[in-house]
A protein has these predicted regions:
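Alpha-helical transmembrane segments of multi-pass membrane proteins
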Residues: 19, 134-138, 173-177
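Transmembrane helical bundles and short interhelical boundary loops of multi-pass, membrane-embedded
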Residues: 43-62, 92, 110, 143-193
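Perimembrane helix-loop-helix junctions
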Residues: 1-21, 31-35, 131
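Aromatic/glycine/proline-enriched transmembrane-helix motif characteristic
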Residues: 47-120, 184-186, 190
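Transmembrane-lumen/periplasm boundary regions of multi-pass, lipid-linked membrane glycan transferases
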Residues: 20-55, 59-68
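Structural signal for the C-terminal ends of transmembrane alpha-helices
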Residues: 2-10, 33, 91-100, 139-144, ...
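Transmembrane helices and adjacent periplasmic/lumenal helix-loop junctions
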Residues: 1-6, 25, 116-129, 155-163
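Alpha-helical transmembrane segments of integral membrane proteins
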Residues: 10-18, 22, 106-113, 129, ...
Length: 193
């Protein structure tokens, strides 16, 4: 969404200092606790081999299929390519409409990105949908027509903690419904995508 906001001239290059400052502030406790800068910068690359499953209780694309016996690396690469492609399409559509989107449109696009990225990426935990949950609540508060999207996204995320109540594939279908509904609202109201 930052790229779209820069294309719309709503952010300046100097605003990047806010992002950099936030990164430094979030790293400060670990630095004070004795972690090296190298360890902090390589934390995600160091974890790449730790998780080999396709989903870790996330209501995602991979929760819709039986992953037993699948080549997790091939499917994982497919999921990464799919997530990258969807993200590139959403960002390019937002850049194309820059300057002509409403605040609700920016909020919808901001919601679509974490919904789509986390839904299609492999090896996701349910907690990675928190940003989508928060943005769906913000969108519903701003635009009452988005209340069903909020209900679906939050229900799918919250239900992952009660696997005995709703199965993970059901939660994934609900999250997919939230993604599609947000996409349809964005396309209809903002002529994006």
């Amino acid at each position: 969404i930052v790229v779209v906001l820069w294309a719309d001239r709503k952010l300046r290059l100097s605003d990047a200092l806010v992002f950099l400052g936030t990164l430094v502030l979030t790293a400060l406790p670990a630095l004070l606790g004795g972690k090296s800068i190298g360890a902090l910068l390589s934390i995600y690359t160091a974890q790449t081999g730790l998780y080999t499953g396709l989903t870790y209780n996330a209501p995602s694309f991979f929760a819709l299929m039986n992953t037993t016996g699948l080549d997790v690396y091939a499917y994982g690469n497919f999921g990464m390519a799919l997530a990258f492609g969807v993200c590139a399409l959403l960002v390019s559509a937002g850049v194309k409409r820059a300057g002509r989107m409403t605040r609700a449109g920016y909020l919808r696009l901001a919601l679509l990105l974490p919904l789509a990225i986390v839904f299609f990426l492999p090896r996701m935990h349910e907690r990675y949908f928190y940003l989508a949950d928060i943005l769906s609540v913000a969108l519903a508060a701003y635009d009452k027509k988005a209340a069903p999207v909020c209900a679906l996204a939050v229900f799918a995320s919250f239900s992952c903690y009660w696997e005995t109540l709703f199965s993970l594939p059901v939660c994934a279908l609900v999250m997919l419904a939230a993604l599609i509904l947000t996409l349809r609202h964005t396309q209809r109201d903002e002529n994006v995508i």
